[in-house]
């Protein structure tokens, strides 16, 4: 059995802790034979290979009596870069428990569990469902809407340094004035309306005018200003911090994507540039 989960990009400007899309980088978990104890084979560096791995912490929280297996983990989702690496593992762990214990969890049950573990649904929801997901988590209740993302390209610049979500949250204010909150909310409303109606020009303007988090975080990502300028020069819809950063994403028409990628590459920044597409499936399971 093989479980595959896409990367995700959350916030998309003003959709703070609420909006996310699934993108074409992937975590895969291959379930091998039963064993005396759990063991995860991987080449992902200094992460646990036993029950202390987040994958198994999650799976055993959902189904504590799972029989141990050998597993193989492969991922091209970089760690601590704002592309939902931990969310992909959480979703995979829930699906692992669901399959091995024959739990027959519904999509909503999976999302409830994932959100409880992660703390907010903006990454785990698109990892589960694919596409664009707008969600809220209030009083331990998740509400969500899944929608197709308008046809476009995502150019992701992934820096060669990590930025932990906790560090990125430390620069945020503890509160906003009522006037600021109303303005920030209205911008977010327009961004979502634009995305849902396919008006990427209007959505892009709203994304670039986020007031919830990017203005506070942009100093943590030194490449952000340069990449935004390239996007603007090439007529992209928007550039934004993916999740808490440091990955920067340029949202653009498909016919402009190659030029924007080439222009970012020409800066010779410390990192890598990737042309990504929407993943419309979310988590999937292939059985032998």
From Swiss-Prot:
Keywords: Amino-acid biosynthesis, ATP-binding, Cytoplasm, Kinase, Nucleotide-binding, Threonine biosynthesis, Transferase. NCBIfam families: thrB (TIGR00191). It comes from Streptococcus mutans serotype c (strain ATCC 700610 / UA159). The lineage of its organism: Bacteria, Bacillati, Bacillota, Bacilli, Lactobacillales. Its main location: cytoplasm. InterPro entries: GHMP_kinase_C_dom, GHMP_kinase_C_sf, GHMP_kinase_N_dom, GHMP_knse_ATP-bd_CS, Homoserine_kinase, Ribosomal_Su5_D2-typ_SF, Ribsml_uS5_D2-typ_fold_subgr. Pathway: Amino-acid biosynthesis; L-threonine biosynthesis; L-threonine from L-aspartate: step 4/5. Catalyzes the ATP-dependent phosphorylation of L-homoserine to L-homoserine phosphate. It catalyses: L-homoserine + ATP = O-phospho-L-homoserine + ADP + H(+). PANTHER family: HOMOSERINE KINASE (PTHR20861:SF1), HOMOSERINE/4-DIPHOSPHOCYTIDYL-2-C-METHYL-D-ERYTHRITOL KINASE (PTHR20861). HAMAP family: Homoser_kinase (MF_00384). One of its GO terms (cellular component) is cytoplasm. The gene is thrB. Belongs to the GHMP kinase family. Homoserine kinase subfamily. GO terms for molecular function: ATP binding; homoserine kinase activity. ATP binds at residues 78-88. Its EC number is 2.7.1.39. It holds the Pfam family GHMP_kinases_C. It is an enzyme of class 2 (transferase). This is Homoserine kinase. The keyword Kinase applies. It is found in: Cytoplasm. GO terms for biological process: threonine biosynthetic process.
